[in-house]
Amino acid sequence: MKSVFDFIVMPEGNRYSNEVNINGDKLIVNSSIENFKLINRKATVLTVPTAFTTPIQEGDEVIIHHNVFRRYYNHQGKEVDSSKTFGDNKYLCQYDQIYLYKRMVKWLPVGEHCFIIPIENNDEWSQEPEQKNKGIVKIGNKTLTSLGINEGDLVGFKSNREFEFIIDKQRLYCMQSNDILVKYEFKGNEKEYNPSWAKSS
């Protein structure tokens, strides 16, 4: 069975990432269905839509929007599944809800999506652990490459674009090509900032 316009996917593991591993011990970090940050966003593609073609293939591992697997409370206070639920741990997912797909061992972006890792804040007078609106391109795209912005480059981005994902135990910010404002030259003291909890996810 295939959907006409949607991918059919299943979560890799549970729908929520409620546990982290700390030194071999499991720690429960969430007990609420309302916390979208801990919804699992990693899925496996079971079928692709029949109405159009994309580079994504059946069996691919993908990173998707949190609303696909989300549970929520309806107007009666009852816990219900997402409207994307297809049954038997299967879910419908639109193409624009997919941000990355994995080909072999490399994550590839869908459309204009790109992923930025923040850098450490070197200001000794600041208590913020990372520099605001600045980071390193970890996963670029064709548009950025055509503009001379490549993976590994230091860039500045628009405010409030910190859409957080954990990809291969790194906390990255997902954004669009037009969220990237400037390419900086490295000064030599920049370091990627990845909080310790992300490495345990």
Where are these regions (language model features)?
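Acidic-enriched and Gly/Ser
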Residues: M1-S201
